[in-house]
């Protein structure tokens, strides 16, 4: 029998196989691929905060079972999620500004300065230059609280295998003007790192 030709069911005595039968997936499901930065919201990009929770509710109501995201690490030179600087660290762009405001780590005025442009587009260069200093302010304000926060201390202990190295790398990267590591001239992390 020609492999490209199927015999009619009447000739074989059995029903033809479904063209895409797959026994590895016992039930059908659907999902969506969308990076959280593409979610609509008040911030400069979508976050893993309220926008993400609303999105999950919407896709669940539509019958979707899966939300696949691109890598969520801190992006490097070009802001591609596929060129993340770490497989463990999170992308600071995905922090929920409203949550930082609710925790009194950023003021309403500081958050308003970071809002998305009126045309809905994101300028990642502007975002980097504005968000990074704002997050440093939030980190300074929250430092005392975090040093006494059991969940944070547990996280630090559990993630010690990569967290210290990431902090040193980040401090060196900043000290070297955010250039590529092969261009670095400073090889000692600043003391405040």
Predicted segments, located by residue:
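N-terminal carbohydrate-binding accessory modules
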Residues: 4-27
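Acidic/aromatic-lined carbohydrate-recognition and catalytic surfaces
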Residues: 19-20, 25-193
